[in-house]
UniProtKB/Swiss-Prot annotation:
Protein name as it appears in the record: Lolitrem B biosynthesis cluster protein S
Keywords for this protein: Membrane, Signal, Transmembrane, Transmembrane helix
Signal peptide positions (record): 1-27
Source species: Epichloe festucae (strain Fl1)
Gene transcribed to yield this protein: ltmS
Chief site of localization: membrane
Amino acid sequence: MSRSDWIFISLQGFFCLAGVIWKSREGYPIIDFPCPLQFIDSSDATLSYGTTSPWFGFRAVASMQSIWDNGPWFWLHLMLYIAQLVGLILIILHETVPHGAFLRKFESLAALGYLSYTVGLSTAFPVFSLWILNQYRAEKLVTAWPRRQEKAFLRTIFWCTGISHIGIFMVAIVATLLHRDATAPFHIGNSLLGVPDCSQFPCSEIAARHARLRQINEMTGTSSGFFLTVGLFSQALEAENKHLSLRVMVRMFFVSLIAGPAAGSADVLLLRDSITRSKKDCG
């Protein structure tokens, strides 16, 4: 195993540990095996239990009802969370499953879903990324997608998730400039960088707990997904006896910072595949 492999595997271990410590310090369970019936139970007991569940649905029906009942207080980050999550899951399925293997796509999605259901997305993404980094070497990175379809797929993810990420932050920034006293639901301190104090604002403490856990999952899980793609890019370069340059790393970091981890991941894979495919075409 190369030095860069160790670096990216260590990064995934760091994200996994960071997610566990972060959740533990804020009172969320590290491992949870809730009853499946709680997905359809909207009783008060289930709603109370939902304050600590790690899965992004947190008893999906109850959580969505809680978000709806609390109006716009938690909508902005939820939209950001869903866009990044969907984009990264599609990228992971693209990387782990050859084109057209729908059953294997379902198996990979089910494995990631069960891990997230029991240990939370902030832990599941790093664990899943560790498996990918250990199983897929550079010579196996490019899937059987036709080149035109692959570029269209990655560019679609890049633009859709990137525009949503930038647009959501623009809404939060405008709301912050218009309401500097942090009383607006879309204020960046209430929506993206933190959660509102529901003892002072008209929102539910349970919904705030859900939102805080989504923020933990989004910050650690999506960072894990982005560095997974950077690790795969590094493997592809090593197969060509090349290494990541400082200029390329700075570019990848700023794309991820501005357009979001999902768009950053798509950009990394487009860059990687342009290198590996071009050599095959020349050969």
